[in-house]
Design a protein with these regions (language model features):
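Active-site hotspot residues in diverse enzymes, especially metal/ion-binding acidic/histidine motifs
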Residues: 1-139
Length: 139
């Protein structure tokens, strides 16, 4: 289990959320949050990066007490997930190692491009977790 997966396990326990892998979700749905049972259902067979990001996103719904999918709720869940999985220190290190190439950075960080772009947007408006002072631009 890598550091990101360990972080997710900790968050699942912290929020008293159960994770169930299932073959019942369609290919269009990687995971879903069921608030009544406090369960995240993740589609069986997801690649590790997609699984981590999908579960973190669904934990964002749990954190915000969402009970339905709206554009605002989806954005909030994405933002929460980005801030849980990334911080400026991690992104700065990946930028150095990957010559600021976004696809390589996402791979190095173990997140989807969507999550990295979400984090970048939050960084630009000052809404990210800070570990170090860095000036990043993920063009």
């Amino acid at each position: 289990m890598n550091d990101t997966e360990q972080r997710l396990e900790h968050l699942l326990h912290q929020f008293d959320v159960r994770l169930v892998e299932t073959g019942a979700l369609t290919p269009r749905m990687n995971a879903c949050w069921h608030p009544l049972s406090r369960t995240i259902y993740a589609r069986h067979g997801l690649d590790p990066v997609t699984r981590v990001c999908a579960v973190a996103h669904e934990l964002g719904h749990a954190y915000h007490n969402h009970d339905c999918s709206t554009p605002d709720n989806e954005r909030e869940a994405d933002e929460w997930a980005a801030n849980q999985l990334l911080d400026d220190g991690l992104v700065e290190e990946a930028a150095w190692e990957c010559d600021s190439e976004p696809v390589a950075m996402a791979a190095e960080l173990g997140v989807t491009m969507h999550l990295l772009r979400t984090w970048e947007r939050l960084y630009r408006i000052g809404r990210t977790r800070h570990v170090s002072a860095c000036g990043l631009s993920l063009s």
